[in-house]
Amino acid sequence: MNPAMINKIKKMQRDMLEAQKKLEQSIFTGTAGGGMVKVEATGDKRIVNIEIDSDVLNPEDKEMIQDTIVAAINDVMRKIDEETQDVMGAFTGGMPGFF
């Protein structure tokens, strides 16, 4: 390989690592139940906050609350996956299976 190509590859690697680090530090929000439950997670899929509207804290609705929390977590994970695909896809040229 010629030196220009090697430098280009190294720059792309640095840019990818920076983009990945930025994604990991980003906060994503997922909601469910019309905003009754809000889940925040980092780009590396760590849940950092869960907010539950006090109007839904009825012990008789335990199953509904649990389902809504699961839906909010799934929503935020989907958003993280989509953003990761969008950001990192720029580096892989849209090749499937890399991120």
Annotate the PLM regions:
Residues 1-29, 78-99:
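Long amphipathic alpha-helical segments used for membrane anchoring, targeting, substrate engagement
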Residues 9, 45, 69:
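Residue-level signature of catalytic and energy-coupling elements of molecular machines
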Residues 28-35, 39-51:
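N-terminal intrinsically disordered, cationic/polar leader segments
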Residues 50-62:
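A short interface-forming secondary-structure element
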Residues 67, 71-75, 82:
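Short, residue-level hotspots on alpha-helical faces of the histone-fold
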